[in-house]
Amino acid sequence: MFCFIDIACYNRLTMTQKKLRKYAVVDLEATGAGPNASIIQVGIVIIQGNKIIDSYETDVNPHESLDEHIVHLTGITDKQLAKAPDFGQVAHHIYQLIEDCIFVAHNVKFDANLLAEQLFLEGCELRTPRIDTVELSQVFYPCLEKYSLGALAESLNIELTDAHTAIADARATAQLFIKLKAKISSLPKEVLETILTFADNLLFESYLLIEEAYQEADFVNPKEYYFWQGLVLKKEKAVGKPKKLSSDFQVNMALLGMDARPKQVVFADLVKAHFNDQTTTFLEAQPGLGKTYGYLLPLLDQSQKQQIIVSVPTKILQDQIMAKEIKHIQELFHIPCHSIKGPRNYLKLDAFYKSLQVQDRNRLINRFKMQLLVWLTETTTGDLDEIKQKQRLESYFDQLKHDGEVTQSSLFYDLDFWKRSYDKVAQSQLVIINHAYFLERVQDDKDFAKGKVLVFDEAQKLVLGLENFSRGQLDISHQLQVIQKIIDSSIPLLQKRLLESIFYELSHAVELFYRHNSFEFSETWLKRLKNSINALEVVGLDELQTFFTATYTNYWFETDKVNEKRLTILRGAREDFLKFSKFLPPTKKTYMISATLQISPKVYLSDLLGGFSSISTEKIAHEKNANQKVWIDTSMPNILDLSPEQYAYEIAKRLQDIMTLKQPTLVLLTSKQTMFMVSDYLDKWEIKHLTQDKNGLAYNVKKRFDRGESNLLLGTGSFWEGVDFVHRDRLIEVITRLPFDTPKDYFIQKLSQSLTKEGKNFFYDYSLPMTVLKLKQALGRTTRREEQKSAVIILDSRLVIKSYGQTIMHSLGRDFEISKEKINKVLTEMAKFLI
């Protein structure tokens, strides 16, 4: 008998009868992920009226041996399947169970196609509508980082035992589906109406769930939302009247439901004791002490008239403090607090509104529009960092980022997220900011920090932030292509002429650089170019405009090669960044909190921050990090005695040995050329690995590494400073070379001359201390959780044979146990340490 159901008939007879509408949530386990896979297990859960009314599970004999990774993934064995029925024996029962249902699955394309094909071979044609819970989750849970079934189960408190067995996954998907239905039904009718205009871009018939919810949805509740120009935005809840904190730190901690730790109490008392003195206070305290509460609580008690500004190294840490410590404090004490970032972190409502007026050819962009419509009903900040997967369509989000301009003519002037964030600073007793934006903000607006209480958390990273702030780069090759593309588009004549002038100035400068191996950036030339750039009104040239609005004192060209393609890089820098004390306006009080105050025997953190006129210093005794150990490979030849090829070979050989430990391994290199040469050796030896800029950009290769696609990752640049590895409980970190600045670097040469004029030794007063800070920052990349263990091996024998090596090891030795051994002994010790 040939079984057949027509989808149009199905829609008429069943879909319009809500009480009878049934959903079959299906999960299959198979011999592989390809189209020729065979089913080995079926799990089905039937839902009607938001309740599970039936379920079914069976093993299926594929009559073939399972691959080892399938056995490992599912726990299903050949012996188990040998007793199972053939698919033909269960096919008609499965068909009868789901024929009048909407087919639901997590990644429905795989499950529905495979099941439909197998049913067809048994004479049953399955043509029911399909709903994909992956894509619906991406739209209606817009702030999650991962959308695998396991990740969603963890985020949404869904029970998932025996993952990767069909019935367990089907039950978890059924619970997810019920939660999705409830979430969609809770949204205002106006939101669902706009979403439905883009819903055809969803996979298969996923829009049916939205249509069903729309029929019974409530209109916007003005107490909860703003409704303006078709957009629904969440209103922020009013904060209660602030409560006074106790002057006793331990009492405040008890009120928050926590016990104060002894060293935390000492730290808090030191913060309080120095509040009224006129010094810049440097406090040394190791991570894990609980220092965030240790400075927030005493300062909120002491500083009731002056605003407190806390600057932290990264936006991620900024978000973490807001979500944890500050949220806790706000809930109890109702203190007005605010987190502010640069304008480009915020959604510009005008730009998003404009993008909603058109259907994009790229269906994923239209899906992100739906996602953002949902997000606007949840966010009160408009901070795009809340959208964790925006990197997938960065070009679209670049169009939506705020430019910092807010005019009265804006449709969303009163609701503009950047304006609201900017204005909220003045109303807050406590402001959280990151080092990079603090520097940018204070450069333009000294009053932002004037007379305030400042706290720089992890102040040692402020030094590195100052160095980055003082320097910038622009890929001129790429910018010229972008400019030409805009010139060729339909833009006003005046803008076209400005762009043609900019294109000529830059391309002519590049031509002269290659002809004479230099180019003089005269004041006249720079002024002429900047005037043209400032007059631009076209979009798409943010990088160009940002670079030329920075206050650099030096400019120069460099060349680089990526995938055999020559790039021309324009760099800019300023030499006064080491005078941070002069950069700051007068403050009520400034605290510098760091895990490291003494960088080297002669250099302290206060020296690198520009010599404050009056400082006080306090240290809290700290212990070494038991979860991280450092090894120096004494068998590594002296780098300076090796050719580039020999050096790459020595690194690659050690990586080959390290991979025998079967642990995730991060390799930090200081040169792209060396990185690619090492990668070539690994390819030659058929060692699976990922390489930045060869297998993808930094963000993408890290994501693949975190997913476990490879246990070996080679990286440079941002991997030293801004990328954390939190997903692996055990990790090996290989530092191939001490991160000294390149002596040939134009800026480094200028800085060396400047420090020499001041009577300082460039190497010992700047270069060596900065290298120590960069090393410690790199070590911190792999210890982001208490239960995380990492083994670090440094392949630079200069630590042993050079006199300054002792200085570096002395500094590292205060925080980590260090061992100096030959590579074979290192591998043995590392294996034991990582058990």
Task: Tell what function each PLM region has.
Residues 12, 16-128, 142-160, 164:
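Conserved non-catalytic scaffold segment of RNase H-like nuclease domains
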Residues 2-18, 179-249:
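Acidic two-metal-ion nuclease catalytic site recognized across multiple nuclease folds
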Residues 102-109, 113-118, 148-211, 792-794:
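Acidic, Mg2+-coordinating catalytic module of metal-dependent nucleases/exonucleases
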Residues 635-643, 697-796:
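Conserved RecA-like P-loop NTPase helicase motor core
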